[in-house]
Amino acid sequence: MSAPTKRENDRARINEQITVPEVRLIDVDGNQAGIVSTREALRAAEESGLDLVEISPTAKPPVCRIMDYGKFLFELSKKQAEARKKQKQIQVKELKFRPTTEDGDYQVKLRNLIRFLNHGDKVKITLRFRGREMAHQELGMKILERLQADTADVAIVEQHAKREGRQLLMVLSPKKTK
């Protein structure tokens, strides 16, 4: 016999899969019926035409409930789908600048930057120096400071400008809106 897969371990045990001698039983209406033998609990589930489902296997004794297992799985999958739908995947977008970026290009990139922030994404700003431009890093810092000032109402600086090799990096994240 092979070892149970992770998927089988995640599923609740039902009916004859419950091997413990005693369980704490919750009936169809959600009322506690107390601690009964597993055999009695199975009989009660059969009489009501439903399944005996182990809700809390780690409790002493395990908690079991009489319910429709198919409906239980359906409700569980609906809850998980709803939780996944509500989760927002935060992405990090990257915008590349140069110390010689002209004003028209700057405005286009600024518009994109604000759009990314309004969508809830973080933005990594990379300012790349070439050749002798490294001697004038203050030009790059001015651009980053200007970006910071222009986005002050929609963004906060998550990572201040720092130098990595031939580039300056800064990360902006959207302000929390409530």
UniProtKB/Swiss-Prot annotation:
InterPro entries: T_IF-3_C_sf, T_IF-3_N_sf, Translation_initiation_fac3_CS, Translation_initiation_fac_3, Translation_initiation_fac_3_C, Translation_initiation_fac_3_N. Gene3D superfamilies: Translation initiation factor 3 (IF-3), C-terminal domain, Translation initiation factor 3 (IF-3), N-terminal domain. GO terms for molecular function: ribosome binding; translation initiation factor activity. Keywords: Cytoplasm, Initiation factor, Protein biosynthesis. Its main location: cytoplasm. The keyword Cytoplasm applies. The keyword Cytoplasm applies. GO terms for biological process: ribosome disassembly. It is found in: Cytoplasm. GO terms for cellular component: cytosol; membrane. Belongs to the IF-3 family. Monomer. HAMAP family: IF_3. NCBIfam families: infC (TIGR00168). This is Translation initiation factor IF-3. It comes from Legionella pneumophila (strain Lens).
